[in-house]
Amino acid sequence: TAAEVTTEAASESAAETSAAAGDEMTVTYPVTITDHLGREVTIEKQPESFVSGYYISTSLMIALGLDDQLVGVEAKADKRNIYKLSAPELTELPSVGTAKEFDLEGCAALKPDLVIVPTKLKDSIPAMEELGLTVIAVNPEDQTKLFETIDMISTAADVVEKGQELEYWISDALESLKKSLDGVETPSVYLAGNSALLQTAGPEMYQSTLIENAGGVNAASDITDTYWADTSYEQILSWNPDYIVLAADADYDVDSVLNDSALADCTTVKEGHIAQIPSDIEALDSPVPASFLGSYYVASILHPDVVTEDDFKTTEKNFYETFYGIKK
């Protein structure tokens, strides 16, 4: 169907644009990159080794073909299905901790040419620089910032062409989805958080964009929190969403929501309009390159007559095969 994105169509579009860009694809060092903290970071020569202190950037580096240059990654890498399926060697690499507890000395001991961290680690960056590390901070919290992150890393590593191919693939997929959903009614969606049903994503979060791209409206669009916001049963009943969608890594399930007596009067529950975003390869509601697939999945729930489950599965299969070498 129209919403389905084939590997051939996306690759042709990427190839045409790459050809038009010509010589701009090769990076000349030193190169200066402005990161998401507004820091101007000069990279003197092409990096040969990287540390990624953030799952989002690690997944992106696999998609850019840079996983074999990683010498250290974030904690709990062995729990990530995406790594096991696409780059199992990453599960054996030294851990540099988390955004809450980053291992500065451990990172420095790996002597990476470039370190990529989330902007949450901004207070640790001066100490990293004192240890002689070159650091860029990223915060891909929406589609624009995701593409900026792809640009930063692909420029730093001199894989601009691969970065552009990835961006064109994602853009084509979202454009195809948008055309398919043109003119549909937009039901309201309550997106429930990972750690609790009574947490939701406000309009500043990537998950809100995911809902809009899927042809829905965020039921919590009037809240001002920039992270997961606490809410209440009364608030959910007041919003009376058409659908409740659970975050991919929620530690509760669809049945527990359907059987929650506090929501017995909610139309959504009565009609069984509850779903959970898939996480069999990786969480499709986190701002990884594949996050556009989260919109495809939610669209298949909200508008199954326009975007089918097969559209989602075919597009998912083609994307992961093209950029991660995963055959489903």
Task: Name these PLM-found stretches.
Residues 1-46:
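Short, low-complexity disordered leader/linker segments with a strong preference
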Residues 33, 40, 123-199, 220-222, ...:
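Extracytoplasmic substrate-binding proteins
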Residues 51-53, 69-74, 114-118, 135-138, ...:
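Structural recognition of the beta-strand scaffold that forms the well-ordered cores
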Residues 52-110, 114-116, 120, 219:
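A short, structured surface patch at a secondary-structure boundary
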Residues 96-99, 103-117, 133, 232-249:
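Proline-aspartate-enriched helix->loop->beta-strand connector
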Residues 121-130, 246-260:
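A ligand-binding cleft/hinge motif common to bilobed small-molecule-binding domains
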